[in-house]
């Protein structure tokens, strides 16, 4: 039975209403600092911890709750007579409910202007200590670290004469240990990343110990294949515009492959400034286009490879209106993603309830790291977020690209970044014409891309080609030129660059080097 609560929170959302409800249930409230002032200003009867312990806060607030009268009241087992006798001897009442969340360390160190001193001052000491004490003694103490749990605790207290079930206490305790582990992991990541800076005046973005923390969003029916189990986890701090921010408006539950493919489509489409559509199959774009609106962009993207688009993932960077919805609804689609859907578009898809509609607000945030598991280890790299600007390009052939060709080259290069290596992409007039992906040799990717265009009835005459990495030999270049390409964009850097450039001059095509490779595995 909860008779006394200690409340000390950094995240004060909902805390006044929660405390008022506790007070209405006859619970005595202890508090500290800013939380105590907030509750007192709201008209609540609050006892400051310093008054409760008889020991003042000291060291600029570093020592507030580190006192036997606090931790004794939390840690005492109510079922052990010797514990209760010790409390009575030292005049220590039990603390039955602890409501604490911690100094905002992660938010502090994420600011560019954050100094080491700022970070250190935002390492909470008393909070984690109380949380761990209460979580350890969860049989007797209810501990709340997440404002989302306020309502659950109140409902149980009202229904059970101020008591909270062991099942709920156990669940809340596990949240505490997960929270403090994440908190300490963030501190470790930050401080170990500074080791090189302190010793060599250069900060290392990759800490000596790398801690990851995610919260489970949902269990999935299965993984990449039906015999694999799976779940989806969200980052503790989801970047603006990231897939994990999705709001599912309708449709079946998302699968593992749906989420993976949706991320590939969304990451590609949101890089465009004009209305764009990206169709993805098995994490590869099979059609990408820009247009005057979503409907035109979709029509052009679908032309690239109607066969592969069947059962694909479609992403837009503009609202899906009725016209676009009607066009998409004629095809079999697994997932449709957009910043928004008009009411008329929603009505179109109401007749196709299996289609998963995901609404995601646009944003340019991205993950800090790209992660890949290997046997017994983890590969960590910065995200491939490099977007080449026109001024960075270098024309290496006798013939320069025309303005139209340059537009097509930049479009092709943007798409190639999201195609599995080896990647060859034919483009023209704001749309992909043929995509060759994931082949072990670049020349085979070139052949496949040209075959794809032929199968779709699209001409490659006058097209632009992007290659995600350099041409190791002239053979790949010969294939794309034979198919009709008149300009090529590629990183360069091959030992045979001179031979490849000479071949381009021989064919009288324009070649542009980016100096940037976009391998994608």
Swiss-Prot record:
It catalyses: (6R)-10-formyltetrahydrofolate + 5-amino-1-(5-phospho-beta-D-ribosyl)imidazole-4-carboxamide = 5-formamido-1-(5-phospho-D-ribosyl)imidazole-4-carboxamide + (6S)-5,6,7,8-tetrahydrofolate; IMP + H2O = 5-formamido-1-(5-phospho-D-ribosyl)imidazole-4-carboxamide. Pathway: Purine metabolism; IMP biosynthesis via de novo pathway; 5-formamido-1-(5-phospho-D-ribosyl)imidazole-4-carboxamide from 5-amino-1-(5-phospho-D-ribosyl)imidazole-4-carboxamide (10-formyl THF route): step 1/1; Purine metabolism; IMP biosynthesis via de novo pathway; IMP from 5-formamido-1-(5-phospho-D-ribosyl)imidazole-4-carboxamide: step 1/1. One of its GO terms (cellular component) is cytosol. InterPro entries: AICAR_Tfase_dup_dom_sf (IPR024051), Cytidine_deaminase-like (IPR016193), MGS-like_dom (IPR011607), MGS-like_dom_sf (IPR036914), PurH-like (IPR002695). GO terms for biological process: 'de novo' IMP biosynthetic process. Its EC number is 2.1.2.3, 3.5.4.10. It comes from the Bacteria. Keywords: Hydrolase, Multifunctional enzyme, Purine biosynthesis, Transferase. Residues 1-145 form the MGS-like domain. One of its GO terms (molecular function) is phosphoribosylaminoimidazolecarboxamide formyltransferase activity. NCBIfam families: PRK00881.1 (NF002049), purH (TIGR00355). HAMAP family: PurH (MF_00139). The IMP cyclohydrolase activity resides in the N-terminal region. Belongs to the PurH family. This is Bifunctional purine biosynthesis protein PurH.
């Amino acid at each position: 039975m909860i008779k006394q609560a200690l409340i000390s929170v950094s995240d004060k959302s909902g805390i006044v209403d929660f405390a008022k409800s506790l007070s209405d249930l006859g619970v005595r409230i202890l508090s500290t600092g800013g939380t105590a002032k907030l509750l007192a200003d709201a008209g609540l009867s609050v006892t400051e911890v310093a008054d409760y312990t008889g020991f003042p806060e000291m060291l600029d607030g570093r020592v507030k709750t580190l006192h036997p009268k606090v931790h004794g009241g939390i840690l005492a087992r109510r079922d052990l007579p010797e514990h209760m006798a010790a409390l009575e001897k030292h005049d220590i009442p039990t603390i039955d409910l602890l409501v604490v969340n911690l100094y905002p360390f992660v938010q502090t160190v994420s600011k560019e202007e954050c100094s080491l001193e700022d970070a250190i001052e935002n390492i909470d000491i008393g909070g984690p200590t109380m949380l761990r004490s209460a979580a350890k003694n969860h049989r007797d103490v209810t501990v709340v670290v997440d404002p989302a749990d306020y309502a659950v605790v109140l409902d149980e207290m009202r229904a059970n004469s101020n008591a909270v079930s062991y099942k709920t206490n156990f669940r809340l305790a596990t949240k505490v240990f997960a929270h403090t582990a994440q908190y300490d992991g963030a501190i470790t990541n930050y401080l170990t990343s500074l080791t090189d800076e302190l010793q060599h005046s250069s900060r290392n973005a990759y800490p000596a110990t790398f801690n990851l923390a995610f919260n489970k969003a949902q269990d999935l029916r299965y993984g990449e294949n039906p015999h694999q189990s799976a779940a989806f986890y969200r980052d503790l701090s989801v970047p603006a515009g990231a897939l994990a921010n999705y709001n599912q408006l309708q449709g079946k539950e998302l699968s593992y492959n749906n989420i993976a493919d949706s991320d590939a489509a969304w990451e590609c489409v949101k890089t465009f400034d004009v209305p764009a559509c990206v169709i993805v199959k098995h994490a590869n774009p099979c059609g990408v286009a820009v247009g005057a609106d979503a409907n035109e962009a979709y029509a052009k993207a679908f032309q690239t490879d109607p066969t592969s688009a069947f059962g694909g993932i479609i992403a837009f960077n503009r609202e899906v209106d009725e016209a676009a919805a009607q066009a998409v609804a004629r095809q079999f689609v697994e997932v449709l993603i957009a910043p928004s859907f008009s009411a008329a578009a929603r009505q179109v898809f109401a007749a196709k309830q299996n289609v998963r509609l995901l609404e995601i607000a646009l944003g340019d945030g991205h993950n800090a790291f790209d992660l890949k598991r290997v046997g017994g280890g983890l590969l960590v790299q910065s995200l491939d977020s490099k977007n080449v600007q026109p001024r960075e390009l270098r024309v290496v052939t006798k013939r320069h690209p025309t303005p139209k060709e340059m537009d097509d080259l930049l479009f092709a290069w943007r798409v190639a970044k999201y195609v599995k290596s080896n990647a060859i992409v034919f483009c023209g007039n704001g749309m992909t014409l043929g995509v060759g992906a994931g082949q072990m040799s670049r020349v085979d990717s070139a052949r496949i891309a040209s075959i794809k265009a032929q199968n779709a009835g699209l001409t490659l005459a006058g097209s632009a080609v992007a290659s995600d990495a350099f041409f190791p030999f002239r053979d790949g270049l010969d294939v794309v030129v034979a198919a009709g390409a008149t300009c090529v964009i590629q990183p360069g850097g091959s030992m045979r660059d001179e031979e490849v450039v000479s071949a381009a001059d021989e064919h009288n095509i324009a070649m542009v080097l980016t100096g940037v490779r976009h391998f994608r595995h």
